[in-house]
Amino acid sequence: MTDQTATPRSFSASVPLKGRIAIPGDKSISHRSLMLSALAVGESRVAGLLEGHDVLATAAAMRAMGADIARRDDGEWRIHGVGVGGLLQPRGALDMGNSGTSTRLLMGLVASHPITATFVGDASLSGRPMGRVIDPLTQMGADISASPGARGAKTLPLMVRGLAPAIPLSYRLPMASAQVKSAILLAGLNTPGVTEVIEPVPTRDHSERMLGAFGADLTVDIDAGGTRHIRIRGEADLKPQAIIVPGDPSSAAFFIVAALIVPGSDVTIANVGLNPTRAGLVEVLKAMGGDIELLDRREIGGEPVADLRVRHSVLKGIEVDPAVAPSMIDEFPVLFVAATLAEGRTVTTGLDELRVKESDRLAVMATGLKAIGARVEESQDGLVIDGTGGDPLAGGATIAGHLDHRICMSFAIAGLVSKAPVTVDDIAPVATSFPNFEALLAGLQQ
């Protein structure tokens, strides 16, 4: 999809990548730090916040509902919260831009407050399904009117009329979704009694960690079958916090793969969050033979962090265990790029969720990789990729990024190992999650 404001960009065969970089703050943690700070009583401070379009949409929405949020000249953010139950009626629609995380989590917050909010977004976000969040929030008493989308999906624009007091519930997640889980837990903050989420497959647990750090009455139990039971007792005050946001592993993924596949590369990526529910890509790439060293392991704000040293490696194709998918769901597009240069066949399954991301990431990656000379077969729930054994790809194509930041960056990395340049039709969407992506890449090529 292109328009008058599209910014095409070509990426060519690269010199070895060398150096040390710090990537932007984790997107998931940045969203949640703003939301919970805005519900605390008092002033919270956040350092290292990701200042991409998605997180700024969350900041604007929390301001619109009464929180005092300001960025200082030194980059630290100060948030004066309104307290749980204190959200105010926004005057206008809340513009979510391209951010599915902002939309789904804020729907949860609004659902248990006595306010009404209209959510709007860009063309990409307005095609994404919201029914998975609407169902549990409706059971808690919220009245939600959504727009009809393709194949019966409930989409933006939508209106949430919150109910206070909301109705606590016990909800078993029908699919692995950290966003649905988080929406219910955030709704539970202002709901009397205990709200429970039953999670058969673990997903990223930033919400649970951060809710605990802010003083929410939250417990996590794992039953004999490995199912997680997350319970939150509502109407407890949240205490303001000082938060340091670690580097985003989903952003680090692009430079991890680039360093592995560009011959002669040796890159250190500082301060990467390695939450076990997010670290699947590192484990999969190591299993493929990737030389990834974890240095100076430490913990910051309840989150495990390390510096990653990554060196060019000969990768081997593997069959990726579908159980690992939730811990790297956003990293599969760039893993597919790595697989195109591996020796042998890489098989991925269980990735239905990729079809309802910012784009249908399975179809878009399969089409684009074929266009630049990769051998790819698309199945209903994954891709099968036969790698080149390290030989460069043909390249020489223009790729439709479909306004999807991770697609755009994945093909940028593919261009670094292609004989002819790979052109991304519009690089602008990268700003949603990684505003300085191109600058960091250029720095490693010096």
Swiss-Prot record:
Annotated phosphoenolpyruvate binding sites: 27, 100, 128, 179, 361, 406
Record-annotated active site: 330
Subcellular location: Cytoplasm
Classification via CDD domains: EPSP_synthase
Enzyme class name: transferase
HAMAP family (UniProt xref): EPSP_synth
Protein family (similarity comment): Belongs to the EPSP synthase family.
NCBIfam families, alphabetized: aroA (TIGR01356)
Function: Catalyzes the transfer of the enolpyruvyl moiety of phosphoenolpyruvate (PEP) to the 5-hydroxyl of shikimate-3-phosphate (S3P) to produce enolpyruvyl shikimate-3-phosphate and inorganic phosphate.
Protein name per Swiss-Prot or TrEMBL: 3-phosphoshikimate 1-carboxyvinyltransferase
Taxonomic lineage: Bacteria, Pseudomonadati, Pseudomonadota, Alphaproteobacteria, Sphingomonadales
